[in-house]
Amino acid sequence: IDRYKYIDSIPNHIIVNMLDNFMKYSLVATVPSKFSSVMNTAQLEMGLSVGEPGGQTGIGSCLMANNGVVYKSNEVYNIPEYQSVAFPASLNDNDRNTKTDIMRYIINELDYQAYLNSMESMFLFILPTDEALKNYVDPVDYHKNQPTITEFYYDYSPSLTGSRIKCKRYNATKNADGTLTRGTEITNPWKNGSTESDYVTNRLKDILENSIIVQDKSATTSTGKSVWVTKGGCPVILEGTGANIRITTPYRKELADQNSSNSPYELKVREVEGYYNMGQNPDGNGETFIVDMEPVMSASKSVSTLLKELATKDNR
């Protein structure tokens, strides 16, 4: 309510999460004697109890209908979706440059919502905006003379059926400092039986898994510089805390190593509403960092290539 001002202004996908938790399909399983066993969507006990009318806790009263019962609660119960590190992806506004519709869509499309809603785990979630997903360097083309940049975008057409995530692919030119300049659009990128839908799903799954860090509950990001490994196996360096955190990905580190100007190559958290500590929401499952430069991307060189380069330097 504080964010959207009016109930009618809250997006449907947020309201649905609340209804999924509070609407139960079995009356028999939700009678007062079974309150202690009623689960939420994360399969954790909701904590229902019998209270007093006008009290501070528990279910104060009920209304009988011809097809069920309405329980009137004296307190607000936790909703896993609102405590999850994935929840900031649902908090969109009217500025398309700050939207995270693509990641919200792919989280649901690939059934990662339940995984990210787990309250038994702690996560660090590096969430790229739709703007960041316009700058994806395809790792399949790293070794080619002609690298490519993919621009993912959300198709808002009302009459659209099927996937709403589309993409455009561009040839790119590699600059002296290792950065890429976007060139002409590739007019027919789908060959050998591949399709746009398959490509989008494959690459966005890779992006999603490299955005998720499963955090040891005893660990913290407040201990200065630390190295983490994403669910997709990508090492990431985090420095600083909260909204001031600096994120160094393998792709960014490689650019820094190629550039002698010592320019900062970290991914920075978005200045406005770029950091969410979901652990304070309350009892949430981690921290979310929103970035609008690019998603987490791997380096272009393999371990064996790096070892060969080191050996060459040592022999000079």
Outline where the language-model segments fall.
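Mature, structured domains of secreted/extracytosolic soluble proteins
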Residues: 1-316
